[in-house]
Amino acid sequence: MNILIDADGCPVVDLTLQIAKRFGVPVIILCDTAHQIEREGAQTLVFDKGADSVDFALVNRVKAGDIVVTQDYGLASMCLAKCARVLNQNGLEYTADNMEALMLRRYENKKLLRAGKHPKGSPKRTKEQDEAFVATLTDILASI
């Protein structure tokens, strides 16, 4: 089992590494050339910039039983299909039960963008979001 991080814009790389170290789980950081993220104790794989290049590389590497950290619903859906556990940076674990609603939200947001309406951006990251992420990842690893 590995933890794979879709690291482009991911605010929990260091938290993930701390928790993974405690459980002795290897971490693979995947990023593009615009976001080269090197961390001691993790393998970093860097890919060319391009639409979804990191996402496709991650999907090609993920195996059943791996854990994936991403905020990309499409990537999460593909990883779930490969029997991985998937969570976002706020501690939400993606499941077959919540994926349909999340994908619908993504579709609606893309429709708004095409219509020239820009959805409100995310607020500043909070300590509570970090705590929720730590709790979810710890629970997943403790249950294995």
Cite the ranges covered by each PLM segment.
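Nuclease catalytic cores that cleave nucleic-acid phosphodiester bonds
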Residues: 2-144
